[in-house]
């Protein structure tokens, strides 16, 4: 599906939200000579959270989307000490204070599943987008179709307006575009608390090595336990250890509109007081003040569609996932790769006058919906299951290491081994059929 030649852009698109998915998509569209404007509600680009990882399928999608996006990631990615991902028993107490029983492991492939600091990756992506294509401080209120049927009218909370041929919502887990597509009274328009939350923090690597040993500190590890688990992996070029410590919370999240709340190291230490020495030592290394993040997702009420006419949603706005697969952001990159490819095809269609812009865009977004809905929602569902498995709550596996390993291996490779080239081939075929 080749891009159009460098003539006057045929399409003028609006992206709502300037996070990783929105910026990556914008870069891919601009590289295909499609004009795009990003509308971001914040006064500056910022990413919440600390570390983030991308699986091999996500890296292949970055390359397909725009090799510059992949280069931006690699510029800030931290290689693991080994190409292994290890799952260990973080719960049992052992006489050797650095020892945790290896339950199972998998080979990630050369430089597979690397992590980076979210803000550093975002900074690299921002460099790919000209300032003239960005509007900050813009909170979307509604989208309507103009009387002539050609343009969509965007209205913002500050009273300003804009026009676009199509609107792509990359506005995160509490997406306004999702509400506009599905309806404000639809439960699927809103994420739900998954009854897990996480203490998140960064630890200086030299202190982590003292507590865990060099290889463990510099290699991605999942520390399993009863009703809680901990993920550790290196970021910031190996200078920091990213720690994400999950706990099950049967109650409701008390902080209403906020997805995070201040927490103390003492709370994390107490939550993991029954775990083995390595996990307790890592908790002791956390900063005195932390954030505790509520894990919300779209599992309970998945969207029936990601599209309405010439509006669509992508990334967390479409299928916010719990982080237990480490695949949420990567799934958004897959979305972006499909959108960039099919919108480039729609631009060619409009340029040839075979269809109107509106007809071409409706067909393109219908294709996107058909290609992405099932897979992305499977990731949401499977991620929930892994969150239970890591805390010995998943009945089919319990604490059986062999069963846990087989389940994790199968589910992980469904994501990691995804054929991105085939996804794009099916995208092109589906779009062509819709034009016939």
UniProtKB/Swiss-Prot annotation:
Family matches, as Pfam families: FAD_binding_3
Active-site residues from the entry: 200
EC supergroup of this enzyme: oxidoreductase
Induction field: Expression is positively regulated by the azaphilone pigments (MonAzPs) gene cluster-specific transcription regulator pigB.
UniProt pathway: Secondary metabolite biosynthesis
Gene Ontology biological-process entries: secondary metabolite biosynthetic process
Residues given in the record as FAD binding sites: 40, 53, 118, 316, 329
Enzyme Commission number(s) of this protein: 1.-.-.-
Keywords in alphabetical order: FAD, Flavoprotein, Monooxygenase, Oxidoreductase, Pigment
Co-factor(s): FAD
Biotechnology and industry use: As colorants, MonAzPs are widely used in various food products for centuries. Moreover, MonAzPs also possess wide-ranging biological activities such as antibacterial activity, preventing hypertension, lowering cholesterol levels, causing hypolipidemic effects, and displaying antiobesity and antitumor activities.
Effect of inactivating the gene: Impairs the production of azaphilone pigments (MonAzPs) but accumulates the benzaldehyde 6-(4-hydroxy-2-oxopentyl)-3-methyl-2,4-dioxocyclohexane carbaldehyde, also known as M7PKS-1.
GO molecular function: FAD binding; phenylalanine 2-monooxygenase activity; pigment binding
Function recorded in the entry: FAD-dependent monooxygenase; part of the gene cluster that mediates the biosynthesis of azaphilone pigments (MonAzPs), a complex mixture of compounds with a common azaphilone skeleton very widely used as food colorants. The first step of the pathway is performed by the nrPKS pigA that forms the hexaketide precursor from successive condensations of five malonyl-CoA units, with a simple acetyl-CoA starter unit.
Similarity comment text for this entry: Belongs to the paxM FAD-dependent monooxygenase family.
Protein name as annotated: FAD-dependent monooxygenase pigN
Organism: Monascus ruber (Mold)
């Amino acid at each position: 599906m080749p891009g159009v030649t460098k003539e006057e852009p045929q399409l003028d698109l609006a992206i709502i939200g300037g996070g990783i998915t929105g910026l990556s998509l914008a870069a891919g569209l601009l590289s295909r000579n499609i004009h795009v404007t990003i509308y971001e509600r914040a006064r500056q680009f910022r990413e919440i959270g600390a570390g983030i990882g991308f699986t091999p399928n996500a890296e292949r999608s970055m390359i397909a989307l725009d090799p510059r996006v992949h280069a931006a990631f690699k510029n800030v990615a931290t290689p693991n000490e080994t190409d292994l991902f290890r799952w260990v028993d973080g719960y049992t107490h052992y006489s050797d204070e650095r020892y945790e029983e290896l339950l199972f492991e998998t080979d990630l492939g050369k430089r597979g599943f690397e992590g980076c600091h979210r803000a550093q990756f975002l900074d690299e992506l921002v460099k790919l987008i000209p300032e003239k294509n960005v509007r900050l401080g813009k909170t979307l209120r509604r989208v309507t179709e103009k009387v002539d049927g050609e343009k969509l009218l965007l209205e913002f909370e500050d009273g300003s307006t804009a026009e676009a041929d199509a609107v792509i919502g990359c506005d995160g887990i509490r997406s306004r575009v999702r509400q506009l597509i599905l309806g404000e009274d639809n439960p699927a328009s809103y994420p739900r608390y998954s009854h897990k939350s996480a203490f998140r923090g960064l630890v200086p690597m030299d202190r982590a090595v003292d507590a865990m040993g060099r290889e463990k500190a510099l290699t991605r590890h999942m520390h399993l336990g009863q009703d809680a688990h901990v993920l550790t992996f290196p970021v910031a070029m190996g200078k920091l250890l990213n720690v994400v410590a999950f706990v099950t919370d049967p109650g409701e999240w008390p902080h209403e509109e906020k997805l995070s709340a201040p927490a103390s190291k003492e709370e994390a230490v107490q939550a993991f007081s029954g775990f083995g020495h390595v996990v307790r030592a890592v908790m002791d290394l956390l900063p005195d003040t932390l954030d505790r993040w509520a894990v919300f997702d779209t599992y309970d009420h998945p969207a029936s569609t990601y599209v309405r006419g010439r509006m669509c949603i992508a990334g967390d706005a479409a299928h916010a996932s719990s982080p237990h697969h480490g695949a949420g952001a990567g799934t958004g990159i897959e979305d972006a790769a499909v959108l960039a490819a099919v919108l480039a095809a729609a631009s060619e269609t409009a340029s040839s006058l075979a269809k109107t812009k509106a007809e071409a865009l409706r067909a393109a977004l219908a294709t996107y919906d058909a290609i992405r809905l099932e897979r992305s929602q499977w990731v949401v569902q499977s991620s929930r299951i892994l969150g239970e498995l890591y805390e010995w709550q998943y009945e089919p596996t319990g604490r059986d290491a062999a069963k846990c390993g087989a389940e994790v291996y199968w589910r992980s490779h469904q994501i990691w081994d995804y054929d991105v080239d085939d996804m794009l081939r099916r995208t092109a075929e589906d779009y062509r059929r819709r034009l016939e």
